[in-house]
A protein has these predicted regions:
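Intrinsically disordered, low-complexity Ser/Thr/Pro/Gly-rich regulatory segments
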Residues: 1-174
Length: 174
């Protein structure tokens, strides 16, 4: 299944655009290979996502089923493109990097729940962003953070936002 097929009328050219919106956390500071960037649930990894995009999803237009779908839509030829959006999160305000990443990518920080709780009363400046709103960055509509919601980070990662629209993940200590 194609994410997007579009036609550039000025160039008279059709494109197959694959889209991915992901959030990855650096396992530690410093230079990292893509396999060291984990999704919030730790099952997803940046290297695997990129491999799937490049070796499977971008190749859809070259498969027999993809060729048939294009033919049915009246498209003879299309050029594949990929667009990856989202954010990369760094451990406790430390920097990490990987060759091939846009140096201007959106960033945030991540904290273990124990360290986050030690940040005096500063953590009450944050609000909880439920997963459907991770891209939204809307502080006013995010849920005010209370102890019960913060306790959720003992079990699974949660994304928070502050009034400066900075986002962070708080993750279990283990």
């Amino acid at each position: 299944e194609f994410d997007v097929l579009y036609h550039d009328m000025l160039k008279d050219h059709t494109f197959h655009l694959e889209l991915a919106v992901k959030f990855f956390l650096a396992r530690h500071a410093g230079e990292l290979p893509f396999r060291e960037w984990l999704g919030p649930n730790s099952a997803d990894r940046l290297d695997r996502k990129l491999e799937r995009l490049l070796s499977h999803q971008l190749e859809l237009s070259q498969t027999p089923a993809g060729q048939q779908a294009l033919k049915t839509a009246g498209i003879v030829k299309c050029e594949p493109q990929v667009r990856v959006a989202g954010m990369l999160f760094y451990p406790e305000q430390q920097k990490a990097w990987s060759h091939g990443l846009n140096p201007d990518h959106p960033t945030g920080d991540w904290f273990h729940i124990g360290k986050f709780r030690q940040r005096s009363d500063e953590h009450w400046q944050w609000r909880l962003l439920e997963k459907p709103y991770w891209l939204d960055a809307d502080y006013e509509n995010a849920r005010p953070l209370d102890e019960r919601q913060l306790d959720r980070a003992e079990l699974r990662p949660v994304m928070l936002i502050n009034k400066h629209l900075e986002r962070c993940f708080v993750v279990p200590d283990d």
